[in-house]
Amino acid sequence: MDIRLNQAYSFHQIGHREYQEDSRFPDVDAPNQEQRFFVVCDGVGGCDKGEVASQTVCESIGKSMSRVDFEDDFTNEDFNHVLDAAYDALDAKRNSSNREMATTLTFVCFHSGGCTMAHIGDSRIYQIRPSEGILYRSDDHSMVNTMVHNGVLTPEQAINHPQGNVITRYMESVDSDQNRCMATVMRTVDVATGDYFFICSDGVLHSITDDELVEILCSDACDEDKMRLIAHKSEDSEDNNTAYLVSIAEVYTDPVTAESAEMEDEDTHETKKIKVASQNLEEIESIQNVSDNGIWNWLKKMFN
């Protein structure tokens, strides 16, 4: 599968925060058109050195991915090696002044096997097709999202919920590899010319709704102007806000990769087809058992 990209665009804004704790890779507003992967991390506020955590993860992933041949398939095992290296980098940075540093992660990579999307926390990934709308939206690892899924809250009640900043997964330096939160990983071959992939920290989501995002991306404006408008809407956010917009120029598909992706259930080892938001995806998800204390006390970006 040969996926060719248009020029990607990014913004990286401090909002109404005193410090910038978001990081991105590559750290430029208009990267080289040969760039095949994109990362946005949001350092966990209220904890030690969130900006160090987000930058460390971005730099580690950038280093690991520099050795990848994107003309080959980038497997879930390959991604797990990249993620492990990022955790190792966090461990290496750990000291008495930043023992609790942590960050979210969003990652998108285009390769011969399709597109791999991965996230930890509440930074988000969208795949939007102008003719159909949102094909995929990552499912936030957050307290309120869990409450919505369990029927405790309605989506409307969740919007301004007082625990809206509590996340249930995050990347941090831990004492054991067994305690590392793993990512939700999606692989899709349903990629078409004109598709948009949008990845962002949650500060962007404070300023723009899904409907507004779709409206902007489906407009007749050029990609640079679309991203400029999203940045303008986000610049007065109460939070740091960072995003990447990547559009698909052309896709050449061979018969093998055009087949539906499948998911293997790690518990039953049964192979079954799944469909998420109108596209066939492969999901490999390993959920960290987060303690009650960890869930309730990790408040993102709470400085007071």
Enumerate the language-model features and the residues they cover.
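PP2C/PPM-type serine/threonine phosphatase catalytic domain
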Residues: 1-304
